UniProtKB/Swiss-Prot annotation:
Gene: ctpB
InterPro entries, sorted: ATPase_P-typ_cyto_dom_N, ATPase_P-typ_P_site, ATPase_P-typ_TM_dom_sf, ATPase_P-typ_transduc_dom_A_sf, Cation-trans_P-type_ATPase_A/B, HAD-like_sf, HAD_sf, Heavy-metal-associated_CS
Source organism per UniProt: Mycobacterium leprae (strain TN)
List of residues binding a metal cation: 28, 31
NCBIfam families per the UniProt record, alphabetical: ATPase-IB1_Cu, ATPase-IB_hvy, ATPase_P-type
One Pfam family of this chain: HMA
GO biological process assignments: copper ion homeostasis
Keywords attached to this entry: ATP-binding, Cell membrane, Magnesium, Membrane, Metal-binding, Nucleotide-binding, Phosphoprotein, Translocase, Transmembrane, Transmembrane helix
Name listed for the protein in its UniProt record: Cation-transporting P-type ATPase B
Amino acid sequence: MTASLVEDTNNNHESVRRIQLDVAGMLCAACASRVETKLNKIPGVRASVNFATRVATIDAVDVAVDELRQVIEQAGYRATAHAESAVEEIDPDADYARNLLRRLIVAALLFVPLADLSTMFAIVPTNRFPGWGYLLTALAAPIVTWAAWPFHRVALRNARYRAASMETLISAGILAATGWSLSTIFVDKEPRQTHGIWQAILHSDSIYFEVAAGVTVFVLAGRFFEARAKSKAGSALRALAARGAKNVEVLLPNGAELTIPAGELKKQQHFLVRPGETITADGVVIDGTATIDMSAITGEARPVHASPASTVVGGTTVLDGRLVIEATAVGGDTQFAAMVRLVEDAQVQKARVQHLADRIAAVFVPMVFVIAGLAGASWLLAGASPDRAFSVVLGVLVIACPCTLGLATPTAMMVASGRGAQLGIFIKGYRALETINAIDTVVFDKTGTLTLGQLSVSTVTSTGGWCSGEVLALASAVEAASEHSVATAIVAAYADPRPVADFVAFAGCGVSGVVAEHHVKIGKPSWVTRNAPCDVVLESARREGESRGETVVFVSVDGVACGAVAIADTVKDSAADAISALCSRGLHTILLTGDNQAAARAVAAQVGIDTVIADMLPEAKVDVIQRLRDQGHTVAMVGDGINDGPALACADLGLAMGRGTDVAIGAADLILVRDSLGVVPVALDLARATMRTIRINMIWAFGYNVAAIPIASSGLLNPLIAGAAMAFSSFFVVSNSLRLSNFGLSQTSD
């Protein structure tokens, strides 16, 4: 298996490879931070290591994959090529959880009698019998050795490379408590005389077997629930990836059918899909009709009808009917694979607050050893007994836990990404999510966003001796060379376009060309008539069409305006409810479009938008967004077309409708694959909920460590309680993140 690579090029024309490696053996945030630091020391390497997903994402220039693996292995970990999600079926978190559960069960069963006997023999020495020390040692040995081996193994590996991690703290605490207990049991001491139960407790022998075993049990329990929760958090993504077909039936030229692995399907090959089967690749229907379940892509259970010439998406399921499809995109080039990559890439990125947490975790473990040593020395200097000072040191070592810092952001993002994918919302990264709470203005494009984008010619008006059919024929001939949605509607209205020469497209204005020796222009009325007066009949047709919310283009032949073509679109049923939902959240909505003022206002009135900014060229849309930001507004932009790309990139939060152009999708921060606009407020709510969860996690993580270590240093925490608190801390963070998996369950799907 080769490493997962993505080629790119920087400004110096040097080849940049994106390499993803799975890193095994990382059990805490300090582990991930150390691997990241080691990788970033390599010249030409920029690396990010995600503790939650155990994936190192590396942008490298002139660096071999083997060199990267060697550096990771020298840091004490194992590196393998990242398994592509589309074929990944193994859940490492579930396997790790099962391993921990076996150790936890054995440790818990032995811990109960060990804790009871250890406490009794320490407080009431008269109850001791011959061989009592060997009994305690026999009960403790499996716990502090085999059950705690995952911690000891990592600690030994760290020591080999002169490093330290959370496991170093745990292992040191367990071994120290065990060693001190063995010394107390097997080294002769002066008998003590105590009177009363409290004196017996306060002056009991320092037998810390129950602490060593208890810390092992609590930490194993915490790690088990953490691993199980992380497995559940990633289940949505694994379920998404598992929807891909494993095999495909290819139609051979002689009509025979051949079953091959899905990965071997090539573009332009014809393949067969039967009821209940998953479509293997993106393609065009050649033969047959069927109903398709698009929920894998859109999150909506609404079936879609497919017939010859229909486009279909890989990863969706045929409910009934039989289809023969010509593959247009296969493997990693399909829309389904791209969506899975979006979810993965979102988990690779780090929020600003997580970068701070990583820097703290990197120096945290050495600091804990220093603090523990200073705390123990202070107690000794204050006249405390060695037993008391050791108890304080042990408490500090056990309670310190940088794991919460490392889990706070990645687990929340993992759950949110998976849940978002189920809802048809794909989060591309943290950049915009960090400003989501400040969003106060939502800007909408019109065509394809608020409307269906399925344009059709409603009326054709002619003048100057031209008939409507001739005007439409000339317009269709020129527009046949254009890809604009208006052009598509005009061409569809006249099925037999004539040949065109000297075609030229004028961005934001219109097109021109030569048809049958006539110079024909089609476009905005103001552009077509800028050098010639407009006929009263055409102007009347324009006003009437725009009053209905239609787009009207003028046609001129040899410099004389001779026709007006009205293009109708349908407002989405979900638009009004979506705008109402946004307004109820206190957000201001704006319609920003390149269409004319009258048509834009007609649509805005239907959906409930008060502010309309029309007749905007693509670059002018960017200026509008920037002006809003300069006025202190935090802006979200919703769009789908090529002309929306710059505005989406300029906005604080860009939301692209998933059926939009690659330019729009590439510039956006959130991708909404449903046609329904009802997903817009849901997407904003999910983003807000994600950032709220991250903030709660970070407050807990920082607050826990800031408060716990001083309390332990002051001697107010028993080491056993400290171990339980440390395990609960990580469990709380992961469980809090898991609440996002229920997001939207109470909301009505559009």
